[in-house]
UniProtKB/Swiss-Prot annotation:
Key words of the record: Decarboxylase, Lyase, Pyrimidine biosynthesis
Molecular-function annotations in GO: orotidine-5'-phosphate decarboxylase activity
GO cellular component, one term: cytosol
Name of the featured protein: Orotidine 5'-phosphate decarboxylase
Pathway: Pyrimidine metabolism; UMP biosynthesis via de novo pathway; UMP from orotate: step 2/2
Gene source species: Trichormus variabilis (strain ATCC 29413 / PCC 7937) (Anabaena variabilis)
Annotated catalytic residues: K61 (proton donor)
Function statement: Catalyzes the decarboxylation of orotidine 5'-monophosphate (OMP) to uridine 5'-monophosphate (UMP).
Organismal lineage: Bacteria, Bacillati, Cyanobacteriota, Cyanophyceae, Nostocales
Catalytic activity, EC: 4.1.1.23
SUPFAM superfamilies the UniProt entry points to: Ribulose-phoshate binding barrel
This protein's encoding gene: pyrF
Reaction(s) this enzyme catalyzes, per UniProt: orotidine 5'-phosphate + H(+) = UMP + CO2
Pfam families noted in UniProt: OMPdecase
GO biological process: 'de novo' pyrimidine nucleobase biosynthetic process; 'de novo' UMP biosynthetic process
């Protein structure tokens, strides 16, 4: 059984732990490499995944001034990963510079350009936190849409959003805009620090292209069984 809509999060502290998990979940074809693992392992983990013909979501969420994010994206694009992320709150100029840099880096390395997607609002952020802590005076769904539209306007390939915003983004941004949803939780898994979650089938029905799922699979007593259980759930989605 395979399901190319599921991206499993390699949220482990080192290369050895990552390899053990990859070997345990042989059926998984798409893996997310985030800050913790990349800081520890560096490009080596990308080489490991490439050697096993796996797809890669490099989720480093770049967030800096335009020149800096451009340099980071140019370098990351040379690895030939499938997806990479930048915070939409870096601003319009940074998003545009990053997109151009991805094209440049891929051309220099002779690889296919990565799809660059913008993080709209972290799934750990609630509407209350957006208003009270971040002092953003708009409703959370509206803010997520604004960030996605800005990214689309400057040429980015898609956005990361919570499952609760995905239907609105799909309707307004169109079918060609890639939507990636973390914060997805099966009914049998704990929500933990995800504030705006849906089940995998609900998120796909709402319009998500990819689901990022970590602990419900990787922390399960039987990770392969948990993955197959979710993949089976998605086969019922029209």
């Amino acid at each position: 059984m395979t399901n190319n809509k599921i991206i499993v999060a390699l949220d482990v502290p080192d290369t050895e732990s990552a390899i053990a998990l990859i070997d345990k979940l042989e059926s998984v074809t798409f893996w997310k490499v985030g800050l913790e693992l990349f800081t520890s392992s560096g490009p080596r983990i990308l080489e490991v995944l490439k050697s096993r013909q796996k797809r890669i979501f490099l989720d480093l969420k770049f967030h800096d001034i335009p020149n800096t994010v451009a340099g980071a994206c140019r370098g990351a694009a040379r690895y030939g990963v499938d997806l990479m992320t930048i915070h939409a709150t870096s601003g319009r100029d940074a998003l545009k510079a990053a997109k151009e840099a991805v094209e440049e880096g891929a051309a220099q390395a002779g690889v296919k350009p990565s799809k660059l997607i913008a993080v709209t609002v972290l799934t750990s952020i609630s509407a209350r936190q957006l208003a009270l802590d971040l002092k953003i005076p708009v409703e959370l769904p509206e803010y997520a849409l604004d960030m996605a539209l800005m990214a689309q306007e400057v040429g980015l390939d898609g956005a990361v959003c919570s499952p609760q915003e995905v239907a609105q983004l799909r309707q307004i941004c169109g079918d060609d805009f890639v939507l990636v949803c973390p914060g997805v939780r099966p009914t049998w898994a704990e929500a933990k620090d995800q504030k705006r979650s849906l089940t995998p089938s609900q998120a796909i029905q709402a319009g998500a292209d990819y689901l990022v799922i970590g602990r419900p699979i990787t922390a399960a007593a039987e990770p392969e069984l948990a993955w197959k259980r979710i993949a089976q759930e998605l086969t019922t989605v029209a």
